[in-house]
């Protein structure tokens, strides 16, 4: 795969030298071969999903930091050096967001994540000029496309939720970490160029289903009760704004139609996502209780944090 080859070539140029690369091959066809002694390959017989693959890579190493990087992303030579320097300077921060830029346009893909009142998450700064985020600052949590995690934090709160399979695992992990009292930094200049949705497609039935289902998983597990009660109403509002954005030729639903799919398919995917969440409700409630028991900040503090890094559902629908 050309994207993966470019990704690995970029890692070979890193100014930070004390690292190893673990590539998890989810193709089921042993398509990835190690390029050097620094690269280790874990080959799965089938696609086990993003969360499981990430956890395999994390368990395969004992390093104090874990850097996540999508196979369709290319890191600037100073990427790791800047992330590790930021981590060394902030021991209470357990995760760090990169300055992720969109391939081609040079605009931002993400400078951390934002969350809506229904549990939807979107990339902070998506489509904006990098100059808008030229200074390092705090973030809610990083996008898993290019992030640094402190192993001590992962040992404490757990790894990625493997039941998500695809999408939103980074938000779920980030919210669990914030509830446990860990901070998150955004590191300006720790630059990665990302071919957005190169691997799974920008707007497909697969993506629509998993994003909606995992939004529900994330909300049920993590949102404060008062927000969880109102989340369905905000979700309905988001569905309405999706229709409006589609008619205006904007947003993911418009992309879905341009890709050749019928918008009439989306309600069925939404229903399927809700049925899946209902089936898994006992486990989600159990996880919610576990997260609450391990919380180190109050519900009020957590709500204030979510409000600080919020995005309204109309904006979610338009992006």
Where do the language-model regions lie?
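Short, acidic, metal-binding catalytic loop of nucleotide-sugar glycosyltransferases
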Residues: 9-18
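Acidic helix N-cap motif at the loop->helix transition within catalytic regions
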Residues: 29-38
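Glycine-rich, basic loop-to-helix element that forms the pyrophosphate-binding segment
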Residues: 43-61, 71
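Short aromatic/hydrophobic "clamp" motif used to bind/position activated sugar donors
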Residues: 66
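Conserved donor NDP-sugar-binding/catalytic core segment of glycosyltransferases
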Residues: 74-115
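A recurrent flexible, glycine/aromatic-enriched loop bordering the glycosyltransferase active site
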Residues: 107-109, 120, 128-152, 171, ...
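A short, conserved alpha-helix in the catalytic core of glycosyltransferases
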Residues: 140-191
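Active-site-adjacent helix/loop segment of glycosyltransferases
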Residues: 180-286, 300-307
């Amino acid at each position: 795969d050309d994207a993966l080859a470019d990704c690995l070539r970029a890692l070979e140029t890193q100014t930070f030298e004390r690292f190893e690369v673990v590539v998890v091959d989810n193709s089921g066809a042993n398509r990835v071969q190690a390029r050097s002694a620094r690269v280790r390959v874990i080959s799965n017989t089938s696609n086990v999903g993003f969360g499981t693959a990430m956890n395999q890579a994390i368990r395969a190493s004992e390093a104090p930091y874990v850097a996540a990087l999508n196979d369709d992303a290319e890191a600037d030579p100073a990427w790791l050096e800047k992330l590790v320097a930021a981590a060394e300077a902030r021991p209470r921060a357990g995760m760090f967001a990169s300055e992720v830029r969109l391939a081609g346009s040079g605009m931002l893909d993400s400078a951390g994540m934002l969350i809506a009142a229904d549990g939807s998450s979107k990339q902070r700064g998506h489509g904006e000029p990098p100059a808008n985020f030229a200074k390092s600052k705090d973030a809610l949590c990083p996008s898993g496309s290019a992030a640094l995690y402190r192993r001590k934090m992962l040992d404490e709160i757990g790894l990625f939720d493997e039941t998500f399979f695809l999408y939103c695992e980074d938000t779920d992990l980030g919210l669990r970490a914030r509830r446990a009292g860990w901070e998150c930094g955004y590191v300006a200049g720790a630059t990665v160029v990302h071919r957005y949705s190169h691997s799974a497609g920008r707007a497909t039935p697969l993506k629509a289903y998993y994003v909606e289902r995992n939004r529900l998983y994330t909300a049920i597990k993590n949102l404060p009760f008062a927000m969880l009660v109102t989340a369905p109403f905000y979700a309905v509002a988001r569905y309405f704004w999706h229709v409006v954005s589609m008619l205006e030729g904007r947003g993911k639903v418009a992309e879905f139609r341009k890709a050749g799919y019928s918008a009439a398919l989306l309600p069925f995917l939404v229903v399927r996502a809700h049925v899946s969440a209902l089936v898994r409700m006992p486990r989600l409630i159990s996880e919610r209780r576990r997260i609450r028991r391990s919380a180190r900040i109050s519900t009020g503090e957590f709500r204030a944090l979510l409000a600080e890094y919020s995005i309204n559902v109309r904006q979610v629908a338009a992006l």
